[in-house]
């Protein structure tokens, strides 16, 4: 149901058709889980009893997995029903093995890009209501051959191959892309998606806005999507932070999901990703307005995460400990309070409860039941640090933005994390950064962007070196992908973030109105 209120003057939009090229579907074969574990840990564990148990549980319970390989979870889908009851409780080793199963050899590394966007009515600029979203999803499904994803009698998403379209709590429209080999394929996928969405949405008088935070409307104006898990989370958020509802209903992001070859490779990429995440936040800062006025931040979206739920967000300083590995991340995740479990096609409220208790069959709402690997995978998706580990690594620090930046964000991270030379240079560069310095950057960048003081200069100077490394990494990949960095190259050259350009327009050409942003950042 959409909650509506009277607000300022309307601003009509006349959009242009976006130039598009065909999307690209990529299908990759998953390596056998235990071959993966041998790659990850460098030992042959296939004969161990515990590993046989992992294999049994894994095959029985992994009805959903990650967007990687043959065992695929589609983001739009509710969890699968757990038809198979665990023969014996999961062990911590099983949970570690789940993460380790993501290891894959370099030739199988892929790029998975996700982005969210705000739908709005052209005539009023109001957010799309659920009924409009349902019509849009049905229209895309019928015209472009997507499979509908339902929760009860409500359409909540679409899937096609390894792509999915899903809804965030306030109706933010998300594309979770397929795992692809090159950035050219990634950008083609984005273009194909935007073409399909626009083809249906424009006939309905609907447009889409690429920014990190809803610039005009208050929480009371945002529709609530009919998804069971969101109701549980919405009721819990005010208990653990002051900005959680803003995060749910008024933010949009773009992120990239990248692979690792081994536990050691995961550690190196995790550390580089965390250290550089504030730079990505600055480069893509694009959320300076709240309810029609400047909000004092360049990335309001990033600031919101500092007071959403600090039990499940942040910079994870333990990743830089010498002892860090898959097991330590499992220990961390076990201590993150739960949100829910999915049983009998319903979400069971488990907010604030312990997954460790669940492992022991002592979860109060479902006493005597033990978790499956489905439950573990679902739990991992409710953890929101700046870099998140599942069976791949998610870079989570960037604001949503216009389509060129949807290609630039994966280009930035692929150039750094998928090239050994650039990755090592970043690790050398950030080796002596202290936890206090990383936290300082995390907390100050949302407000001051690239102008944040750092050591003897500004963060802009570090960012210039990092973007240079990303470009060199892309050049060495040999796919002629460096052009996708043009958007961020201009930002580091001038030190002016996208948000600062929007503020300049607001105080100048726009006459202190945010309404023109709906045309400026229209997809």
From Swiss-Prot:
Enzyme Commission number(s) from the entry: 6.3.2.2
Domain of life of the source: Eukaryota
PTM: The Cys-187-Cys-407 disulfide bridge is known to modulate the enzyme activity according to the redox status. The oxidized form constitutes the active enzyme.
Pfam families, per database record: GCS2
Name of the protein: Glutamate--cysteine ligase, chloroplastic
PANTHER family referenced in this protein's UniProt entry, alphabetically: GLUTAMATE--CYSTEINE LIGASE, CHLOROPLASTIC (PTHR34378:SF1)
Gene: GSH1
GO-annotated cellular components: chloroplast
């Amino acid at each position: 149901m959409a909650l509506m209120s009277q607000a300022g003057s309307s601003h009509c939009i006349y959009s242009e058709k976006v130039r598009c090229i065909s999307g690209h579907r990529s299908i990759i074969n998953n390596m056998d889980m235990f071959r993966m574990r041998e790659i990850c840990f460098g030992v042959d564990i296939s004969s161990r009893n515990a590993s046989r148990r992992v294999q049994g549980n894994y095959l029985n319970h992994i009805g959903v997995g990650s967007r990687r390989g043959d065992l695929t979870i589609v983001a739009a889908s509710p969890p699968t029903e757990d038809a198979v009851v665990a023969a014996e409780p999961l062990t911590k080793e099983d949970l570690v093995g789940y993460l380790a199963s993501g290891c894959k050899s370099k030739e199988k590394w892929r790029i998975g890009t996700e982005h969210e966007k705000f739908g709005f009515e052209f005539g009023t600029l109001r957010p799309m209501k659920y009924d409009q979203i349902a019509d849009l999803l049905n229209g895309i499904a019928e015209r472009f051959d997507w499979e509908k994803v339902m929760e009860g009698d409500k359409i909540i998403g679409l899937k096609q191959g390894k792509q999915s379209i899903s809804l965030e709590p306030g109706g933010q429209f998300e594309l979770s892309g397929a795992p692809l080999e090159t950035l050219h394929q990634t950008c083609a996928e984005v273009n194909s998606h935007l073409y399909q969405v626009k083809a249906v949405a424009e006939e309905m008088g609907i447009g889409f806005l690429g920014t990190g935070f809803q610039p005009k409307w208050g929480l009371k104006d945002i529709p609530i999507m009919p998804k069971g898990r969101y109701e549980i989370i919405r009721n819990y958020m005010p208990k653990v932070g002051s900005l959680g509802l803003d995060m749910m209903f008024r933010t949009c992001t773009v992120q990239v999901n990248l692979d690792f070859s081994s536990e050691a490779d995961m550690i190196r990429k995790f550390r580089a990703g965390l250290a550089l995440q504030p730079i990505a936040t600055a480069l893509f800062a694009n959320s300076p307005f709240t309810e029609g006025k400047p909000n004092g931040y360049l990335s309001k979206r990033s600031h919101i995460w500092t007071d959403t739920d600090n039990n499940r967000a942040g910079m994870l300083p333990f990743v830089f400990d010498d002892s860090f590995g898959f097991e330590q991340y499992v220990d961390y995740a076990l201590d993150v309070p739960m949100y829910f479990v999915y049983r009998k096609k319903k979400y069971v409220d488990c907010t604030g409860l312990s997954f460790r208790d669940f492992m022991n069959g002592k979860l109060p709402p479902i006493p005597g039941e033990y978790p499956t690997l489905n439950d573990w995978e679902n739990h991992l998706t409710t953890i929101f640090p700046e870099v998140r580990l599942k069976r791949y690594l998610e870079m989570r620090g960037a604001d949503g933005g216009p389509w060129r930046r949807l290609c630039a964000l994966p280009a930035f991270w692929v150039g750094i994390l998928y090239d050994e030379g650039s990755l090592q240079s970043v690790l050398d560069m950030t080796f002596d950064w202290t936890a206090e310095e990383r936290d300082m950057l995390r907390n100050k960048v949302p407000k001051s962007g690239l102008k944040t003081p750092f050591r003897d200069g500004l963060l802009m100077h570090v960012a210039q070196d990092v973007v240079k490394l990303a470009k060199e990494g892309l050049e060495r990949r040999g796919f002629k992908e460096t052009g996708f960095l043009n958007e961020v190259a201009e930002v580091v050259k001038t030190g002016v973030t996208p948000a600062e350009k929007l503020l300049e327009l607001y105080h100048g050409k726009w006459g202190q109105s945010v309404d023109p942003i709906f045309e400026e950042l229209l997809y």
